[in-house]
Amino acid sequence: MADREMAAFGAGAPFLRKSEKERLEAQTRPFDLKKDVFVPDDKEEFVKAKIVSREGGKVTAETENGKTVTVKEDQVMQQNPPKFDKIEDMAMLTFLHEPAVLYNLKERYASWMIYTYSGLFCVTVNPYKWLPVYNAQVVAAYRGKKRSEAPPHIFSISDNAYQYMLTDRENQSILITGESGAGKTVNTKRVIQYFAVIAAIGDRSKKDQTPGKGTLEDQIIQANPALEAFGNAKTVRNDNSSRFGKFIRIHFGATGKLASADIETYLLEKSRVIFQLKAERDYHIFYQILSNKKPELLDMLLITNNPYDYAFFSQGETTVASIDDSEEHMATDSAFDVLGFTPEEKNSIYKLTGAIMHFGNMKFKQKQREEQAEPDGTEEADKSAYLMGLNSADLLKGLCHPRVKVGNEYVTKGQNVQQVAYAIGALAKSVYEKMFNWMVTRINATLETKQPRQYFIGVLDIAGFEIFDFNSFEQLCINFTNEKLQQFFNHHMFVLEQEEYKKEGIEWTFIDFGMDLQACIDLIEKPMGIMSILEEECMFPKATDMTFKAKLYDNHLGKSNNFQKPRNIKGKQEAHFSLIHYAGTVDYNILGWLQKNKDPLNETVVGLYQKSSLKLLSNLFANYAGADAPVDKGKGKAKKGSSFQTVSALHRENLNKLMTNLRSTHPHFVRCIIPNETKSPGVMDNPLVMHQLRCNGVLEGIRICRKGFPNRILYGDFRQRYRILNPAAIPEGQFIDSRKGAEKLLGSLDIDHNQYKFGHTKVFFKAGLLGLLEEMRDERLSRIITRIQAQSRGVLSRMEFKKLLERRDSLLIIQWNIRAFMGVKNWPWMKLYFKIKPLLKSAETEKEMANMKEEFGRVKDALEKSEARRKELEEKMVSLLQEKNDLQLQVQAEQDNLADAEERCDQLIKNKIQLEAKVKEMTERLEDEEEMNAELTAKKRKLEDECSELKRDIDDLELTLAKVEKEKHATENKVKNLTEEMAGLDEIIVKLTKEKKALQEAHQQALDDLQAEEDKVNTLTKAKVKLEQQVDDLEGSLDQDKKVRMDLERAKRKLEGDLKLTQESIMDLENDKQQLDERLKKKDFELNALNARIEDEQALGSQLQKKLKELQARIEELEEELEAERTARAKVEKLRSDLSRELEEISERLEEAGGATSVQIEMNKKREAEFQKMRRDLEEATLQHEATAAALRKKHADSVAELGEQIDNLQRVKQKLEKEKSEFKLELDDVTSNMEQIIKAKANLEKMCRTLEDQMNEHRSKAEETQRSVNDLTRQRAKLQTENGELSRQLDEKEALISQLTRGKLTYTQQLEDLKRQLEEEVKAKNALAHALQSARHDCDLLREQYEEETEAKAELQRVLSKANSEVAQWRTKYETDAIQRTEELEEAKKKLAQRLQDAEEAVEAVNAKCSSLEKTKHRLQNEIEDLMVDVERSNAAAAALDKKQRNFDKILVEWKQKYEESQSELESSQKEARSLSTELFKLKNAYEESLEHLETFKRENKNLQEEISDLTEQLGSTGKSIHELEKIRKQLEAEKLELQSALEEAEASLEHEEGKILRAQLEFNQIKAEIERKLAEKDEEMEQAKRNHLRVVDSLQTSLDAETRSRNEALRVKKKMEGDLNEMEIQLSHANRMAAEAQKQVKSLQSLLKDTQIQLDDAVRANDDLKENIAIVERRNNLLQAELEELRAVVEQTERSRKLAEQELIETSERVQLLHSQNTSLINQKKKMDADLSQLQTEVEEAVQECRNAEEKAKKAITDAAMMAEELKKEQDTSAHLERMKNNMEQTIKDLQHRLDEAEQIALKGGKKQLQKLEARVRELENELEAEQKRNAESVKGMRKSERRIKELTYQTEEDRKNLLRLQDLVDKLQLKVKAYKRQAEEAEEQANTNLSKFRKVQHELDEAEERADIAESQVNKLRAKSRDIGAKGLNEE
């Protein structure tokens, strides 16, 4: 990446990559590969040095510091060449060893480049200063960049993970490890920041956020401050050290947008809560609270702002310079707000934190003479108990005297001070840990959104390997975790290496380096390993650390190589055993391991926590079960509670979960390194860094790299860089493939040829070989440079010598000139010349000056003009520049808009494809959903049956209540009789009072009477006491009666509530069903099918609505019954008060009477016993009803869970199908690419054919030139023979051409047959797949039948169970009716009933077991069905692929048909040529006949000549020789004549043979043409049939849509009737629905318009195809014309005929052109019409969008109204709570008054009756007030329920409206897509029309040129004719 490219990174560029200048300087640095080395050093680990000498296996070297050292040769390690200085990926180092890695990191760190790659790792060094490499500019620069395209950075790792997730559709993980202070937390924050920026959900998240909460991105980012406050602390190395590990999963949607997040935590250092080292401090939250930023918090927690007041937090430092605790506290508090914590939750967290502070200050002392602790002051205990919601005395008692279970009894145990202190520390740690885990769970709940999520990226921030002087249990857990992670890395790394080798085709034996660490892992985690032995020892009560050590030694010492006995060194902590880890040997001290692993708590205090009034604390310990947790009845073994699980077991469980998560992801590794322990920026401590490199696996990774081929270079780069080693191997100017060149080059070098391998694209090197090649290259370069220097020096010296020679020559010339001048200077003429010469020059200079002045004036004027012109131009230029900039901005904006539009278009096309695929999937899933629908209806029927059973139970209860009321009336009658008897007694009491008064008057008269009266008073007091007891008993019996009544009412309310719950669940199921129906309707609407099923669903919906009405009516009836019950209860209460009042009056009378009847007491006791029996029976009945209701609820929950699992399974199937779809897409792309290659190859062959035809035409033209020599026939008769030979050769060529054409035809037919055969095979394969699919479906049906049988069996079992329950109910009713009459039989029946109940419970358990087995079989069958469905999907996909192949073969057939037509046209042209040849033959025949006539004339002339010769022979005997020669000529001519005759006969025979061939070809052509026409007709019929079918489907869909709208309107009307209370809101919603219906109508109209436009487009496309065919015909005819024109040059007559034909064809083409023009104009008109339609569609779409927005606004208003109603509901709840509080106060006052009443009764003994009556009146008033308050409370509860129901209905309605709006939006988007597609098609049609016009113009132009050439040829032929005539005439004259 060049410097200009690095400019994108802004100010961070210098901190990320070296500049080009630095790289050049580094490469030119002097370097000697043999001498420059690393040597070991005690302080610095390794130092750079130069070798001085080598002797006897030892090396002497001089270090950089000038120090001379001698070391062994195997300790010396070579340095890397300067090319590798500050390399970004250390795996590319040619010498890959520890010092090379160390110095590369050190040099990069010195340049502040803190990120470096090491193979798969990214190593980061903590800079201890701020660097500008995390800003928004850097984030933008890394976005979308590959790893190789950008410098190393945590953003690059994050972006690669994000891109891999989107492209590979696989979960990713980023593993960030390192020591404390290395920067893990900061890098984790940066990763989260990067994802929050690039994958933000944007506006949607802002709309969705609730008031007070942030967006999802804010919440993810703000989770860190909250967790850091409670999980981070200051350590020696780091001011903000994370004392826990975390795995943050960030979930994304299918498009890569943020969906949700969750956090898992590991190994929180809870010991820090109570203990810190001197240089460290506790968790930040304690000091943040003490910072006094929120004073009200200090008051609430009862603490001061001085940390030293609290023992737990003042053991180390209390302030940190780099942290502002007050600001951090505000950040923590605001983070809680953003994360949605309620004020109650925040206060609970702060209270528990404050309680831990006070825990540390609790003091205890030893009791005298006892080993027993007691509190030393209770102030701190009171504070902590108050904050925790506990009783202080109970807390102290639990700490000092805990209860311990011994056998089956609990015993109080004494604790000493040390044990109490340990218990306090353990409780504080446990509270803090559980609170931290609760916070993580609460944050996860906030980050869990309801948005769909597809993939996640996990970020693991966990402590690295630890080797300290004192290593304990915590270090073992951390090191074990890192051992597992390192094994995971090793395995993953070499799996990737192997994949690379496999991809490159390199032979490689796989070595699983993950197994190297298996021995150590097994030693720790396997059975009888360290962890299992530790857990085993924890179970034994007498086990100690030493017994644990002994067991370890017995099992592992000497048996495992990784387990060793340590060597203890003085001054260091004692170690008990050593483990050999991958990072080194670690000595472990086992003191306190058993205690740490068990981590016991004071269970008495934990029990107090569980009962705490602080809700958070009780929730934290709600699931805690100690060591004595009870055994589960259903299982054989005891199972401890989750809270008592050992630390090691819990850690292993969490670690296994983490490893499972990581294995399911694609990992990325980041290793953080701390450079020094002083936190100094830029300083690197070499031993510390080397220790970390060993610990974090970087050197382990390098070790693995060295086993393979760590260095690899692309062939092109290798050839370019190392060609210099042997240029002869790759010659210049000769093209050689890069791989072959690299093979030749490496083969020619003197190196070990086993050290490299050749891949497909790269050459791979073992470690060190590349350095050797670099050394050879440097040597070669030095030799070349030396040679260049020598040559350049020679050239320079030669140039210098040449200059010296030139100087010498010039000196000689100057000397000669001076000598000549000295010889002539004294001549008189010369002197005269010297005088005149200056004068001449002065005159000339004056003229020149004058001219120059004039010129200066002109130039000055011109300059002024040019200046003015320049200014004008500059002004113009400025304005033009401004315009240019404006235009550029406009162009840029247009380009951006265009790019955005293209992106949107591409995205929409992709979405369309995905939606089409989803539509296909949904059609296949439709049947499954219908089956699920049927199952739901069956379950609904079952629930209805259960509801009816519950109603029957309620009726039974009501009957029992009626019986109880009757009995009560009977008792009331008895009470009335008693009152009548009491009235008689009252009269007696009146008489007695009179006598008493008389006695009192005579009191003074007689002391004896007084004594008697005193005795009477004593007896009366005794009677009063007895009567009071009786009254108390009666009141107790009344209270019990009241309680029974209350219990019955409570049971009734509970049953009514359960009934409501079941009804609500039914309503929810019905709502879910309606949603499923709507989805089905939507899918039917999209798929254009299944109209009948939709009507069924609508009928079912109407039935459900009827049922809903019935249920609502039933609810109203129940509410009325409840009201009646309440009124009856009020009457009973009133009656009770009257009775109590009457009883009190009776008691007063009895008191005075002093008598009591034992009979009444016995009757009261009997009644009381009967009431108690009835109460017990009713309680049993209510318990059983509650059990049945709970069972029903459980069944309902199970059914809901099953539905959820089925939905999850369907989603998984969907994901699998999408994956297979993408794979098939890839296969299809491969096939299409192969087809394109075949088409290209075919085009190349056609080009070759054309070139051959051109060559043939050239040969023809040459042949024609040879034919011109025919004109010399008149002069030489011998040329006839050559002309005949030329003609025969042409005939042979034509024969060859015809045979070639026939061969091509045969090959084409053969290929056509092959294609047909392939098509038949594909059809057979498709049929086979269809058969397999049918068989799979058959198997699926069988499995479904089996499943149905199982469900029927389950239903039968449930029926048996219900029967048993009914029998139980019958026995119970029987027992209740006969209870009063037969007590003995009742007891026996009770025993039998108990036995029957036990049997029934056993039967229920058996049934449940069978149900669970049936559920398992059901799940198994479901899985098999899913597998079968997957097979079906695959077979469907294969069938679809076969269909695609068939379509491709159809296309190929069409292409072959076109080729056949072309061959047919060529055949026609060959026929024409044959005809022309026949005409030429005819001409030749004529010429031959003429030649015969000439021959006869020649014979005659010959005879005449012979006669003359004979005459001459007689005269001249000497002329014999000439006669003999003439005779020879004659013989030759005769032979030539014979040859010509034979040639002519052969030509005639060949012509006849060719004519026969042509006839046969014509017949075959006619047959094939007829067959093709027949097939085309069949195809047209099929197309028409399909079109008709589609139209029928569209009509059916239209009808279904109308039915749907009608049913929707009907449903809306029903809703209007049901929602009478919300008329205004319903009006708005119905208006929105009407708008939606109008939008649907508009959509229909748009669809019809789109169909019309589609038809028009199809017509246009067809017209366009016709145009193309016409143009192809014109082009072919043009070729024919050219061929005929070339033939015209040879034969003039043929030229004239062809010209006539051309004129005819020209007329035809002109007519066709006119047709084309007309078609083009019609196309343009259609385009205009389509544009108008498109604009209309766009306006309509915009209107629909506007209507959607209006509907959205109305929905928002509805939501605000719902929120207002929710507020009203909250107010109602507050008022009800207030009334409840008032009720409690009233009850308290009643109790007080009762107490006062008792006191008043005692006072009444002394004569205070009036006061008692007043108090009773007051009590009655208070009871009336209480009844009124209870009525009001009941009314408010009723109103609250109504409002809750109304809110639910409103939310449901708003949800429905939102779904409608979403559907409308989808429709609008689809319409816009179609509109764009039609636009694009129209534009393409216009472009094609324009191209056709241009082609037509081109053809017309070529035709004109052809005509011109024909005219020229005709003129040339005429000239040749004239010439031939002249030559013939001349020849005749000469003869």
Curated annotation (Swiss-Prot):
Listed name of the protein: Myosin-7
Ranges of residues in domain IQ: 781-810
Comment field (misc): The cardiac alpha isoform is a 'fast' ATPase myosin, while the beta isoform is a 'slow' ATPase.
Pfam families: Myosin_head, Myosin_N, Myosin_tail_1
Modification type Phosphoserine: residues: S1137, S1269, S1510
Primary site of residence: cytoplasm
Biological process, per Gene Ontology: adult heart development; ATP metabolic process; cardiac muscle contraction; cardiac muscle hypertrophy in response to stress; cellular response to 3,3',5-triiodo-L-thyronine; cellular response to angiotensin; cellular response to hydrogen peroxide; muscle contraction
Annotated disulfide bonds: none
Keyword flag Translocase: no
Modified residues (N6,N6,N6-trimethyllysine): K129
Residue span of region Actin-binding: 655-677, 757-771
Keyword field: Actin-binding, ATP-binding, Calmodulin-binding, Coiled coil, Cytoplasm, Methylation, Motor protein, Muscle protein, Myosin, Nucleotide-binding, Phosphoprotein, Thick filament
Region annotation (Disordered) ranges: 1915-1935
UniProt organism field: Rattus norvegicus
CDD domains xref list: MYSc_class_II
Complex formation: Muscle myosin is a hexameric protein that consists of 2 heavy chain subunits (MHC), 2 alkali light chain subunits (MLC) and 2 regulatory light chain subunits (MLC-2). Interacts with ECPAS. Interacts (via C-terminus) with LRRC39.
Coiled coil feature spans: 840-1935
Gene: Myh7
Modified residues (Phosphotyrosine): Y1308
GO molecular-function terms, A-Z: actin filament binding; ATP binding; ATP hydrolysis activity; calmodulin binding; identical protein binding; microfilament motor activity; protein-containing complex binding
Binding site for ATP: G178, E179, S180, G181, A182, G183, K184, T185
